[in-house]
């Protein structure tokens, strides 16, 4: 852990953000990665096993005195949430009891853009918009959460456009 702490301390002078993508778990790689952290962002999906793992990681972060812990919920499928087949963002947030800074819908665009080597944010998709909003929240901006209902989202956008016209 001392080496990563030293490395991150040296990098702080040159960078506003230093992101370390670390493995979830209790092994040494995780412990080394969080040693220099002053903030943690836990990314999970709305499946029971993933939430259980996220809860364990949050406990480890708290045990290591990392006080600023946020949550991103990835691969939300509004149609499944609506049918009761998937936990909602609120359900996951209630279970894990840490602030949610983003929810990313599960979209075909993600797979397509990754396979084509295209940046998702340029695609104009809901997932791309969610990623941009997460970045804005990380930088301290207050950004409302988007409606994950793809059909209602389109209607809201159209009505918003018509109101401006």
Show which residues each predicted segment covers.
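Secondary-structure junction/capping motif
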Residues: 87-88, 119-120, 153
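Secondary-structure transition/capping residues
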Residues: 15, 103, 121, 142-149
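Generic serine detector
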Residues: 49, 88, 113, 125, ...
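A general boundary/transition motif marking the beginning of the first structured unit of a protein
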Residues: 80, 122-126, 146
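C-terminal boundary of histidine-terminating zinc-finger modules
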Residues: 114-130
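P-loop NTP-binding site
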Residues: 99, 129, 133-165
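Conserved catalytic-core segment of NTP-binding enzymes
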Residues: 2-112
């Amino acid at each position: 852990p001392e080496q990563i702490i030293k490395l991150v301390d040296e990098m702080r002078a040159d960078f506003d953000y230093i992101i370390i993508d670390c493995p979830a778990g209790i092994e040494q790689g995780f412990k080394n990665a969080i040693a220099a952290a002053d903030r943690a962002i836990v990314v999970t999906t709305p499946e029971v096993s993933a939430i259980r793992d996220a809860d364990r990681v949050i406990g480890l972060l708290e045990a290591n005195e990392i006080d600023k812990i946020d949550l991103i919920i990835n691969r939300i499928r509004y149609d499944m949430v609506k049918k009761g087949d998937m936990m909602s963002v609120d359900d996951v947030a209630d279970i894990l009891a840490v602030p949610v800074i983003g929810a990313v819908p599960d979209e075909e665009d993600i797979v397509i853009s990754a396979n084509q080597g295209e940046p998702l944010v340029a695609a104009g998709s809901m997932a791309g918009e969610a990623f941009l909003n997460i970045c804005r929240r990380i930088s301290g901006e207050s950004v409302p959460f988007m409606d994950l209902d793809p059909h209602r989202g389109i209607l809201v956008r159209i009505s918003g456009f018509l109101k401006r016209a």
